[in-house]
Amino acid sequence: GNHGKSHYAMQVLNPKEDINYPMETPVAMNEHFYKTVVDQITDNLLGIKLDEEYVNSLLSVLEANLTYIPSSTSKRELADISLFDHVKITAAVASCVEQYLAAQKEKNYREVLFENAKESYEKPMFLLYSMDISGIQNFIYSIGDKGALKGLRARSFYLEIMMEHIIDELLEKVSLSRTNLIYTGGGGCLIV
């Protein structure tokens, strides 16, 4: 497990600021900071149109504001999960459960999930999908010496954009959002 004592400073993502490296000094919870974050999220949500892209826009707003806030403020717990990651994974699980119950034409979610909780744990509500594009290294590194660095960057960028497009198309086809994207990088991804 994670037994480190490092903490991130509580701040919102800001490309103009330095990288928020973990520090050994414990971070004090600040009520004023939390109010500022809530106000920022509220202001950002006012500008988001409620349509099929809403969830992805909301996800971006939450990522910008909650990445460096711990999901637990209890002094008895290790605060090593960000509030953003907690919210994102919770939304991914909820969307899987909702899709499964809708496919089963289940109307009474409370009965299925709470009153018959033990049985619901046995249901196949989740699928972990892994994708890997083979041959990426060959594509990236099959380049001549002249302008090699520029060529490597261009090919790497091309693959990243292609992968993001494939992921977005796949998520759209199965009626999921980017909340269900657990990881993407190096020509691979994990989706729940």
Predicted regions and their residues:
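Regulatory and interdomain segments flanking nucleotide-handling catalytic cores
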Residues: G1-V192
